[in-house]
């Protein structure tokens, strides 16, 4: 009996498969197809997220370089007024261009399918517009800043190293016209702190220029008391320039804080890293 029952069951199964073999085959194909599509989409997501992650990291790296370059610009002008070798900023424009290109590469990636990453990305892009304007405006002033380093790097050190006023006047005066001209070129900068710095320094430079003419006259006439008074006035102006330049270094850092992108990039990086781990 058990054998007969088993045979009947076997026949029913065969009959079922025979009658429904087409449906069963389609079901198998459907399941396999869905699995393949799911794996492809998963791999595509993984690839997209990794591309975003690498691009964001590239932006972060270039942003740090751009930020350091901006800060060095402030230090360079301050060092120029101190009469010590300034930090070179001649490669600043290239660094800013590299940053902009890394952002452009990120913009070309498709991340609209992920709402969280897309939102964070949009926040970064909106704030980056301000940073982009800032570095573009600074790029236009780099030649003038480098010219200041070239024309003014010895101007203020002369009075501190040469104690004889008869020697001070001609060597100092020879540098003044080109130095004043270099600072004047910065007065029209669209960066407010830079324009303000140039205006203040130019006024003090012009004042020193007037003092130098008086110093030469007093030196010729041998008026020792007048000579010492003028030298002290020039030194006072020089000290004021250094204070103003130091204030500019702080102003430029404050401007950077207002448009800082570090947290936005970190958040974008963190979101993308989590997605990669989830997909894997």
Cite the ranges covered by each PLM segment.
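Interfacial alpha-helical end/capping and short helix-turn segments at domain and membrane boundaries
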Residues: 99-114
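Extended amphipathic alpha-helical interaction segments
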Residues: 121-243, 258, 262
């Amino acid at each position: 009996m058990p054998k007969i029952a088993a045979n009947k069951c076997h026949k029913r199964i065969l009959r079922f498969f025979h009658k429904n073999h087409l449906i069963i085959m389609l079901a198998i194909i459907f399941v396999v197809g869905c699995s393949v599509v799911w794996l492809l989409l998963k791999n595509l997501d993984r690839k997209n997220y990794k591309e975003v992650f690498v691009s964001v990291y590239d932006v972060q790296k270039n942003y740090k370089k751009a930020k350091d370059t901006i800060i060095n610009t402030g230090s360079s002008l301050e060092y120029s007024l101190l009469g010590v070798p300034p930090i070179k900023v001649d490669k600043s424009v290239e660094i800013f261009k590299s940053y902009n290109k890394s952002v452009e590469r990120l913009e070309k990636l498709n991340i609209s399918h992920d709402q969280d990453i897309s939102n964070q990305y949009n926040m970064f892009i909106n704030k980056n517009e301000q940073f982009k304007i800032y570095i573009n405006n600074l790029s236009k002033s780099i030649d003038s800043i480098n010219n200041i380093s070239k024309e003014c790097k010895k101007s203020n050190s002369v009075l501190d190293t040469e104690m004889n006023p008869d020697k001070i006047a001609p060597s100092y005066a020879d540098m003044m016209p080109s130095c004043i001209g270099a600072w004047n070129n910065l007065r029209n900068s669209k960066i407010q702190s830079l324009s303000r710095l140039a205006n203040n320094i130019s006024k003090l430079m012009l004042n020193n220029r007037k003092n130098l003419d008086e110093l030469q006259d007093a030196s010729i006439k041998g008026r020792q008391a007048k000579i010492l008074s003028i030298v002290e006035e020039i030194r006072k102006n020089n000290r004021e320039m250094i204070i103003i330049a130091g204030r500019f270094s702080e102003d430029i850092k404050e401007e950077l804080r207002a448009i800082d992108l570090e947290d936005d990039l970190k958040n974008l990086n963190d979101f993308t890293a989590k997605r990669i781990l989830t997909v894997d």
